């Protein structure tokens, strides 16, 4: 009998544990809204999110006028819209209750208490995390989307409500079931009634306000709510996954660095500082690293977060005031304005409150201009700033407080022979003096990283040269299976070198991979020099040197002694051939399907796998290639005049390097190879 009691107790406990585990993913989202526009798309009237995962009541994302259970990458979303009823013009001005019930592995949508749709999905727990967030307007934190309407009430329940329980709910009246979170939007300030979410950050403030007991959201308006925040300090794991890089900077988490733009960079009081964008629990934040040599970095606690600024930290640059104080200019995501902040301590951990930049015309009126990726620089004693986008705007100030609108950045004499129209968007901009020119380092969202060289005329920028640093057209897409060299940032080193980074978009993990730092120089011949950072030589060990190698067609020379998945090569070809020659490396498990780096004096390009950066050898000029292999990421530098990056499908512990020639015997003066240390150990 005692045995049966114990068995019964065990079964009850086991069933209870399993039920609790299942119920962790059960929840209900409810929101009452009066729509004002059905033509907005992929906005949410209530989203719960933790990290990159979210569930939300999303409108018009897949098909105009229809509701879905929005989720990260549509993992828990039914994308079949064929049987769903669409909102019409008749829906406008009428309050609608929309609800999503997550129960077990079933998701049910309700409109005004009646079943709208249902489907099966593997639901997840988003309510057990103290640092989750809730958003209105946008699809999710770090994303976009719009809603146009008045939200009367919004709630989250930690259980799957029944049809009757949903129908019993009334806006602005307490329910018998205690909500996990509840907004009734009454009073003068936004308050979440359970006290769970004590912080509320509005975005695009003119388009969102609490008024007359409603949250009134118009296109691009948004609200993010979150509780007390534990400061985040990114940290590289002690035992990272095998495919994580060894000597490239990247974001280890929390959150993801997509975008992962390198942003304000400084050399200040003996220390280098670099910021970059990542998506924190409450939106776009600036990760902060510091280093004494630009090789070994440490993370600071992330302080530039929406909880402090009131908006997301988006693309921007660092500069110094006339007095030598570090400052940053950036786009305040969701604020509709570009912003300025000033450092308040030597470690660059404390910053002033943001100051919105509001330029005026000569008549004191606000100009018709875009507010987008900015940059700021000094010319003489005057500060100039651009606001990016198509045909960017220009402004100037004597004090960083009062800004005069100057019209367009680009001079009306913009040349027609640069190979790129002036309307090609200029974002992630960085303007600086180099040699006897002014360089505008930037991106186009279509072309990736690029640069202009030129000068100022009539207080306008007049470029006379343009070139790309990326040769994969992005077409405004983030992840497309090919590495994109994107979003540059630069700074001056202690000894006056101009050093730049760029975000390498590849769609893999970890996110926020930064390119190797590159030194830029513009000598008297006017040709930009691009070199790997000198300090990278600190990482070399186990040197191998080979000299005077003869390579014949059909008989590749293999570098059999070069091993490891983190290596640097320096290969010099004497009197290079007009025909194609070069280097094969990497490949799959069998050594096939590798990548080739191809040169030749009759070629106009340097082939690096499937990209063709412009590159020509001068008559009688030797060719020196510096090649960095970090797992499956390859960066190539040719005669300090060209550089390219490529990511391969496979990682090999033996890099499978060989030198080839197509038609004639090739002389390789010298090969140097090194293994490379990890920057994380």
Language-model features and meaning:
Residues 27-37, 144-171, 181-189, 668-677:
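Extracellular, beta-strand-rich glycan-interacting domains
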Residues 93-102, 109, 431, 569-571, ...:
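Short tryptophan-centered beta-strand motifs in secreted/extracellular beta-sheet-rich domains
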Residues 30-39, 58-124, 140-141, 156, ...:
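Extracellular glycan-interaction surfaces
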Residues 18-24, 28, 36-43, 48-55, ...:
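Extracytoplasmic low-complexity segments
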Residues 43-71, 572-574, 580-604:
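Glycan-recognition/cleft segments
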Residues 119-150, 174-180, 645-670:
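Flexible glycan-contacting loops in extracellular carbohydrate-active proteins
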Residues 221-421, 427, 433-481, 502-547, ...:
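Beta-rich carbohydrate-recognition and catalytic domains
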Residues 22-37, 44-46, 54-61, 94-97, ...:
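A carbohydrate-recognition surface predominantly in extracellular/luminal proteins
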């Amino acid at each position: 009998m005692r045995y049966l009691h114990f068995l019964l107790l065990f079964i009850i406990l086991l069933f209870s544990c399993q039920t609790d585990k299942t119920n962790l993913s059960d929840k209900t989202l409810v929101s009452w809204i009066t729509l004002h526009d059905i033509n907005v798309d992929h906005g949410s009237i209530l989203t719960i999110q933790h990290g990159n995962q979210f569930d939300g009541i999303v409108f018009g994302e897949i098909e105009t006028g229809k509701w879905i259970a929005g989720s990260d990458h549509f993992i828990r979303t039914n994308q079949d819209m064929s049987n769903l009823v669409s909102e019409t013009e008749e829906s406008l001005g009428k309050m609608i209750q929309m609800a999503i019930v997550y129960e077990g592995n079933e998701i049910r949508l309700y409109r005004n208490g009646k079943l709208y749709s249902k489907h099966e999905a593997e639901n997840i727990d988003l309510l057990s995390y103290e640092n989750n967030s809730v958003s209105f307007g946008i699809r999710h934190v770090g994303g976009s989307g719009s809603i146009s309407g008045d939200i009367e009430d919004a709630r989250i329940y930690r259980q799957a409500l029944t049809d009757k329980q949903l129908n019993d709910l009334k806006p602005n009246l307490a329910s018998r079931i205690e909500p996990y979170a509840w907004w009734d939007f009454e009073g003068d300030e936004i308050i979440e009634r359970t006290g769970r979410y004590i912080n509320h950050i509005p975005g695009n403030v003119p388009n969102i306000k609490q008024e007359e007991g409603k949250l009134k959201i118009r296109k691009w308006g948004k609200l993010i709510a979150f509780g007390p925040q534990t400061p985040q300090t990114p940290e590289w794991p002690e035992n990272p996954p095998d495919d994580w890089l060894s000597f490239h900077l990247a974001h280890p988490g929390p959150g993801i660095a997509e975008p992962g733009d390198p942003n304000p960079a400084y050399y200040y009081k003996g220390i280098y500082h670099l910021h970059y964008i990542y998506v924190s629990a409450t939106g776009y934040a600036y990760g902060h690293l510091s280093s004494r040599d630009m090789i070994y970095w440490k993370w600071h606690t992330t302080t530039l977060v929406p909880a402090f600024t009131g908006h997301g930290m988006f693309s921007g640059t660092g500069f110094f005031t006339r007095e030598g104080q570090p400052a940053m200019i950036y786009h305040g995501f969701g604020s509709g304005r570009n912003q300025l902040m000033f450092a308040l301590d030597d470690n660059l951990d404390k910053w002033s409150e943001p100051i919105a930049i509001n330029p005026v015309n000569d008549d004191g009126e606000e100009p018709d201009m875009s507010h987008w990726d900015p940059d700021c620089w000094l010319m003489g004693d005057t500060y100039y700033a651009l606001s990016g986008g198509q045909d960017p705007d220009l402004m100037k100030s004597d004090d960083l407080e009062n800004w005069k609108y100057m019209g367009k950045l680009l001079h009306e004499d913009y040349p027609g022979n640069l190979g790129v129209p002036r309307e090609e968007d200029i974002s992630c901009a960085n303007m600086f003096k180099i040699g006897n020119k002014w360089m505008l380092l930037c991106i186009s969202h279509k072309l990736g990283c690029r640069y202009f060289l030129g000068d100022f005329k009539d207080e306008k920028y007049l470029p006379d040269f343009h070139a790309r640093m990326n040769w994969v057209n992005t077409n405004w897409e983030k992840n497309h299976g090919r590495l994109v060299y994107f979003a540059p940032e630069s700074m001056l080193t202690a000894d006056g070198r101009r050093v730049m980074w760029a975000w390498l978009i590849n769609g893999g993990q970890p996110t926020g991979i930064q390119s190797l730092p590159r030194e830029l120089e513009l000598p008297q011949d006017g040709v930009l020099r691009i070199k790997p950072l000198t300090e990278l030589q600190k990482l070399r060990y186990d040197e191998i040197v080979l000299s005077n190698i003869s390579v014949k067609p059909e008989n590749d020379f293999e570098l059999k002694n070069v091993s490891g998945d983190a290596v640097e090569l320096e290969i010099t070809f004497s009197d290079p051939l007009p025909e194609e020659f070069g280097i094969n490396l990497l490949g799959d498990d069998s050594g096939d399907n590798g990548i080739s780096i191809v040169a030749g004096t009759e070629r106009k390009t340097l082939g690096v796998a499937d990209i063709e950066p412009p590159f020509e050898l001068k008559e009688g000029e030797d060719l020196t290639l510096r090649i960095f292999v970090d797992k499956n990421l390859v960066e190539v530098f040719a005669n300090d005049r060209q550089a390219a990056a490529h990511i391969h499908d496979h990682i090999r512990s033996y890099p499978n390097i060989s030198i080839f020639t197509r038609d004639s015997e090739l002389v390789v003066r010298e090969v140097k190879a090194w293994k490379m240390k990890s920057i994380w150990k």
